[in-house]
Amino acid sequence: MTATDTWSPEQPIVSIRNIRKSFGALEVLKGINMDIMKGEVICIIGPSGSGKSTLIRCINALNDIQEGSIKVEGMEVHRPDLDKLELRKKIGMVFQQYNLFPHKTALENIMMAPVLVMKENKTEVEERARALLKKVRLDGKENAYPGELSGGQQQRVAIARSLAMQPDVMLFDEVTAALDPETVKEVLLTIKELAADGMTCILVTHEMGFAREVADHIYFTDRGVIVEHGTPDTFFDNAQDERTKLFLSQIL
């Protein structure tokens, strides 16, 4: 029996139970619980240092946890014998920094992991990579190097690179934070289109208007706990906790 034999699409695609994470003596996640269904768009917001980026890095096993459980399609992410390659096929992640290889073209950057890591057929991967560049509205930029692209274009190549592994869940960690204001919109549009196609997306973001428009559910974190969560309308128009109200009053 494989780790995913007991999972079905009617169950949460990501299930987080009572996770705790510390860096030395500092506990940054203090018993987080969350269920995310297939096709949902989840936005995690909160002040700096609230644990939101650490949380999604734990989902992808980039950070370990001290207690609790994270399952993706029934696969226990933090079990000792985890096949990281299997996990990387299930979960894609895009960071604030694009981390593209500067001496590789946009097309080559997208193709690298499927060809070199997954040993997929190069011709088939190239066809998929070209389709992904078109999907993120960068057709015609196949042979461009990262230095020839704007920040927003590089971030869209990074998104296409993650999609090339054909994941079921996409994680976005403040992907617009390092971008010039005029390029933020094009990246958010790409994520919005992914969500419309049914991709399960978990985003850490400071883009409140985007969160309100696209999210199915919003989680507000502060000091390592989920303070409040709800639908966008409920969250923004009828917040209950004083910490949530204070945070929203400072950014809206």
Regions found by a protein language model. Name each.
Residues 9-232:
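ABC family nucleotide-binding domain
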Residues 2, 222-223, 227-252:
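C-terminal boundary and immediately downstream tail of ABC-type ATPase nucleotide-binding domains
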Residues 1-8:
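Short, low-complexity, intrinsically disordered N-terminal peptides in bacterial proteins
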